[in-house]
Amino acid sequence: MDNMYNVAVLGSTGYVGMELVKLLTNHKNVNINFLGTENNEGKYLKNIDNTKEYKNLPILKENNSFDPSMSDYVFIALPHSISNIHVKKLFNKIKIIDLSADFRLDDYEVYKENYGSSHSCKDLLKFFTYGLAEINRNLIKNSSNIAVPGCYPTSILLPLIPLLQNQFIETENIIIDSKSGYSGAGKNFNVSKIKSKNDFNFYNYNTNEHRHISEISQELQKHNTSKDIKFSFNPHILPNFRGMISTIYCDLKNNVTKKNIIDVFKNFDKFNP
């Protein structure tokens, strides 16, 4: 008989939080018993999001009112610099899955440089597992604290890591061209700019300066046995709400064929359905 797990979601009314709740409600082993919010306590999620028929969900409560003894897992879907405050209070009291950037980077100084904010529990960074399931599956199974990867990094690491592990590509001139819908910027993004008839196009931003570069580099380097990895990262915003694609250009090492590449990805996909 499958186990049922009581699950809490803090920050359940943001874009990430609402999408997470949709996924969790379709999981046969999950019972959502707490939904946290910053500004909508006393309401139901269906009052905020009418894109899905939510059933049997608890009323929204203030994030700080969460009691970790009532749940088996807590997902924290709050912005960076806010999430770590909740983690500090909940650490060692419940299994934590954090969806912010607060625990993805191994080095606090790198975090501070990229996100421009202090960290209330930088000493806990070492206790978090980078939650890229297809790569770190066994580590995740044995960890009580998971840092969910960023959106751009996920789209980049999944294709590149298998190639690095097999030493199929040169590591000095990788070009990454990524495109994202504007939901990735969160609810505070100025949608009116995108919807303007004069701006119905996509555009690049933060070329080679995006804060996800450190996360991408950190995780790629863990699977690279030769020289330091050098890449350019060119992110773009598309004039649509959601979606992401990364096109990556690499130089193949000598004697690596198209079939070699396809076989690597087929094998990777076989074990990561």
Residues covered by each model-derived region:
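N-terminal Rossmann-like NAD(P) cofactor-binding subdomain of oxidoreductases
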Residues: 2-207, 226
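Charged docking surfaces used in two-component/phosphorelay signaling
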Residues: 184-273
